[in-house]
């Protein structure tokens, strides 16, 4: 069901059994897979490619222009896999250059107020706590847990199954299977 009060471009490719609520905004160069739910006031911008079975909650912006001084208007992409839950007020930027991509894998849970910046690559089955900020060009593995208010500085890498505790800010890589805590970051567990 697509609400007649949603603004959906006729050029957008919308899959089967997609629900788009009133006041959602979907631009021309967008692909939304089957069985997705787009709640009110969501904006899905050009260059966004979304798989199936995703839920996107109110006031989220997907595929926003990158917050990067190097951006010159390239037609870049945001790729979102299948089965993700993207809660309220999340912003995910697309890549800076036309040959780049921001990638969100499958079955991730992004809680309220998360920001994922340009050219970041996120694996699968990760949890991003409230207000977590992932800067540009980061690489996040699989099954990582970010507690609330974590800040990952540009170019950081996080290995599989790491856990980052609330309020941690880091600019160096977090190895797999590590508990990271504090500011500046230190390792435990």
Residue ranges: model-predicted function:
Residues 183-189:
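Conserved beta-strand-loop-alpha-helix hinge in the C-terminal portion
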């Amino acid at each position: 069901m697509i609400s007649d009060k949603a603004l959906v471009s006729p050029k957008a490719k919308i899959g089967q059994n997609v629900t788009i609520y009133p006041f959602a905004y979907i631009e021309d160069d967008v692909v939304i897979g089957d069985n997705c739910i787009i709640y009110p006031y969501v904006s899905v911008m050009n260059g966004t490619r979304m798989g199936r079975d995703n839920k996107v909650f109110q006031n989220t912006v997907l595929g926003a222009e990158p917050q990067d001084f190097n951006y010159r208007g390239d037609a870049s992409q945001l790729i979102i896999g299948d089965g993700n839950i993207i809660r309220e007020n999340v912003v995910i930027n697309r890549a800076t250059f036309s040959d780049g991509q921001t990638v969100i894998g499958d079955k991730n849970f992004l809680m309220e107020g998360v920001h994922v910046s340009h050219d970041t690559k996120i694996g699968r089955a990760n949890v991003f706590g409230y207000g977590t900020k992932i800067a540009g060009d980061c690489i996040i593995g699989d099954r990582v847990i970010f507690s609330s208010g974590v800040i990952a500085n540009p170019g950081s890498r996080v290995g599989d199954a790491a856990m980052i505790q609330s309020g941690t800010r880091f600019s160096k890589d977090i190895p797999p299977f590590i508990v990271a805590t504090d500011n500046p970051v230190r390792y435990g567990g």
